Amino acid sequence: MAAPRQPEEAVDDTEFIDDHHDQHRDSVHTRLRANSAIMQFQKILVANRGEIPIRIFRTAHELSLQTVAVYSHEDHLSMHRQKADEAYMIGKRGQYTPVGAYLAIDEIVKIALEHGVHLIHPGYGFLSENAEFARKVEQSGMVFVGPTPQTIESLGDKVSARQLAIRCDVPVVPGTPGPVERYEEVKAFTDTYGFPIIIKAAFGGGGRGMRVVRDQAELRDSFERATSEARSAFGNGTVFVERFLDRPKHIEVQLLGDNHGNVVHLFERDCSVQRRHQKVVEIAPAKDLPADVRDRILADAVKLAKSVNYRNAGTAEFLVDQQNRYYFIEINPRIQVEHTITEEITGIDIVAAQIQIAAGATLEQLGLTQDRISTRGFAIQCRITTEDPSKGFSPDTGKIEVYRSAGGNGVRLDGGNGFAGAIITPHYDSMLVKCTCRGSTYEIARRKVVRALVEFRIRGVKTNIPFLTSLLSHPVFVDGTCWTTFIDDTPELFALVGSQNRAQKLLAYLGDVAVNGSSIKGQIGEPKLKGDIIKPVLHDAAGKPLDVSVPATKGWKQILDSEGPEAFARAVRANKGCLIMDTTWRDAHQSLLATRVRTIDLLNIAHETSHALANAYSLECWGGATFDVAMRFLYEDPWDRLRKLRKAVPNIPFQMLLRGANGVAYSSLPDNAIYHFCKQAKKCGVDIFRVFDALNDVDQLEVGIKAVHAAEGVVEATICYSGDMLNPSKKYNLPYYLDLVDKVVQFKPHVLGIKDMAGVLKPQAARLLIGSIRERYPDLPIHVHTHDSAGTGVASMIACAQAGADAVDAATDSLSGMTSQPSIGAILASLEGTEHDPGLNSAQVRALDTYWAQLRLLYSPFEAGLTGPDPEVYEHEIPGGQLTNLIFQASQLGLGQQWAETKKAYESANDLLGDVVKVTPTSKVVGDLAQFMVSNKLTAEDVIARAGELDFPGSVLEFLEGLMGQPYGGFPEPLRSRALRDRRKLDKRPGLYLEPLDLAKIKSQIRENYGAATEYDVASYAMYPKVFEDYKKFVAKFGDLSVLPTRYFLAKPEIGEEFHVELEKGKVLILKLLAIGPLSEQTGQREVFYEVNGEVRQVSVDDKKASVENTARPKAELGDSSQVGAPMSGVVVEIRVHDGLEVKKGDPIAVLSAMKMEMVISAPHSGKVSSLLVKEGDSVDGQDLVCKIVKA
């Protein structure tokens, strides 16, 4: 074997150097050459990838060396290729696997020889510990930057290293005397020494081929996995076995040796913070190692190296137990990932020393004698990887969309493929960058690392930054007392607070709108308003502008808060005027704009509202349809809306609509769900609960009333008005309503509500009904709600005020009339100066309306197209809130041209169902039946005659079954019996048949699926499980869109248009749409380019109009325990089951290999395998559906 070539033996390179200088006269290498007296070589190749070649290239350039990179086809866009002076692909495309390319010894040596390379540095991993590679490099006449091949063979084999330590009288952990290849040998060791043990690959490191086994049941599978991983990673499946030490520290010593037998140490590093035996965070020097133990470890490390004439850089590794006894593990004959922290505390460039030693320099020539080497301060290194800690550190793949590094004093970054646009594949190690920070003390260095981690911005792939931040902030790490299994032993480390990634998620939504248009259901076209809304200026009685920078602080809310619900009710009743409830924030936009007004637009006028309506009875702003629509269509949290509005309007009581035993859902729920919901609503800001039941079922109503009482809210027990009580032939007459009032009063409500949802309460009927109630209950406050569908709303509300009502409903003028509430301006003008004066400033109310006039144009895509009042409502009795939705639904069902027929069918459907009170959800039942009749061309007679064979809408069957309560006068027969066939018939309120919800379990499930859970989340889930889950998934993808101005929520900006998004106080994004790229026929995507705070970002968006074959695998659905998903991206290397096989919980299903790691996919529960969707060799992404396991 040829000896390593030394400078004095080198061939004459004059011709090469002359040619090189002719070609590169102006290169940096020529200018630097004078600074390198020792270096006589000209070109170095690094046989590696990622960050270590870049690290080596930088030092090589400082030493005036030309640099050569090699790369696999999969790495053709990697950064290390660009950082070298020359770069050559290993083999041809498809010739090698992604990892195999970097293990292709002959090919790499061939490239080096063809391109005049003098030195080859192996980096770490891959061929760095391969003696054959080192030997072939030197046999080819080049210099291997590392130990001799003989040293690699003797020390790289951990068994040989162990025998060496025993000869040198260095302590070792009890273990097998040599390598083992058979399971029986491992079994024999455990029979002698017991458990726990550790199985280690005899060649290589980095945690591959390493398994801790704690009992006999795990032994065989762990042995097979360790040998398989070792064979895949290092080409040799040999392993050895040791006794496993519990909670030791992992201390390693950095060594340097020259070609003349000289060896020095560069002190120690503490590498105890590990996961699966792979180092995560390293510290230099070790913080709490006793001085005498440190000195003995350092001396033994040097003794071991000298005993084998160690050359170049290496690391001696030790375990230190809790009694400070230390044991030699191995010597790694290569540079380590964590060499950076030693460089930071010693000031020594280890890579430069490596190269110069390889070139023949002595330690003395380099000034590296032991007496000259000392440490200063501390350094800590973190490895930032594309791993998802919340999913067992499964590697994430994809495109890095944003990459912003940390920096500043004491921060060193050694990067690899961390840059915007980089594609992270499953083929290689997941590390993006090493972040090393130094400080004069351990605590200063620790704080600096935490600051640097928080400063990083990496988007497009998951990273371990949240986990690292949690780790470095843990008290044990702060104390510096971690051990090797600290991460596994400390589950609280995984209570992560991740980066919100708000800007990039927002861009994903904006990009989708730019490519595909708005996806908001019900939107037709784009907003008519293109400019900004001009906010009104309010003036006081003296004509001076009001300061609306802060909200008003005096109103009926203060009476309620200070004196309680009973006193509040007495004060309302004692008030001489008729108060106003403004419905603009809920029912008005529900009736005219499909409930689509967003929180941001309510908040923009909230302070002005608190001043202008300071004397209002309440603001109706929550509950009813706004609750589910917020999540379903606006992608907002209704609780967040309530919290924000409450803060902005502290002086006016907030009123919500509560559907009795339904809560805000469309069907009955268990009683405990209603009580829980009301408690959360009261806590979050609701004051007055307008409780009603769609059928005026007193038993249903009682549940809601008692729940509000328990929550200590204001109970407004509400009776729904339907029909025409002046018509003696109608079902609902005055005695009916008075009897209802008598029953409701028994529940001790604070206020009585009358809910005229269709606007059919005529003025003369209003006088009779309100007057009769007032006469019977002179001390009970009365509040009347109506719609102006017939155009008589103002007259009816004035009649109510004159008859003794304490509060009536109205909406801002621009959102009033038709299916909405009567005009507030008209009511104020009618009552102004009378004994019923509401006490509001008409000028301020009118000023407020200028905002809503503009805003209605912004929401023009949701207009129903109504042009005026519809007195026909007295016939069909369609509720105002339903009428606009019914028009839209009819259009969607292709019945738009049959609207008149639909209205007549609504009357017929109502008669068929027994003339029910029509309000959500019973109004939906009537509407569904009406559309069903029109679609199927059915008459009322047809429905009755064919009821036994027709497939009725679900809502109709639920009503007939009794799931919505008991209607006045009973269910219609024979329709009910015929339609239900074999379904049950309930004769009591449905809640009595429902089991209480397990609210604690719901909270646990939410936390498990989404990382956090509040009681508000539980309440939302209880009302609308599927809607809540869809909303959470949407937010996970696109973030909180409630901060986005409505114009850009509904339509894309113009190219080059700049707009602002305020994420929170003091944090504003300045955005500009730059371009929309062409369609990629391969992916069906377009690239959308935005400027964000002056920085160009891009997002890839699926073009929904493109026809691209969808080859994506189905995903395992969260929450469905029968579906088994891939825990990470990778290749399926083994399938252990087949369809129909019975498995037990924990049985292996398949084995994945990714990023040089293997992972067994286990059965989550016992059952039978079905729908096995993968086979050996398949590539899968994280959460791809592998199979289903049907529970036994």
Curated annotation (Swiss-Prot):
The keyword Zinc applies. The modification N6-carboxylysine is found at K755. Pfam families: Biotin_carb_C, Biotin_carb_N, Biotin_lipoyl, CPSase_L_D2, HMGL-like, PYC_OADA. Residues 1115-1190 form the Biotinyl-binding domain. InterPro entries: Aldolase_TIM, ATP-grasp, BC-like_N, Biotin_BS, Biotin_carboxylation_dom, Biotin_COase_C, Biotin_lipoyl, Carboxylase_cons_dom. One of its GO terms (biological process) is gluconeogenesis. It catalyses: hydrogencarbonate + pyruvate + ATP = oxaloacetate + ADP + phosphate + H(+). Residues 1-23 are annotated as: Disordered. Its EC number is 6.4.1.1. Substrate binds at R586, D587, A588, H589, Q590, R659, T920. Residues 40-492 form the Biotin carboxylation domain. Its main location: cytoplasm. One of its GO terms (molecular function) is pyruvate carboxylase activity. The modification N6-biotinyllysine is found at K1156. SMART domains: Biotin_carb_C. Disulfide bonds: none annotated. The keyword ATP-binding applies. ATP binds at K158, E242, H277. A divalent metal cation binds at D587, K755, H785, H787. Coiled coil: none annotated. The active site is at R334. NCBIfam families: PRK09282.1, PRK12999.1, pyruv_carbox. This is Pyruvate carboxylase.
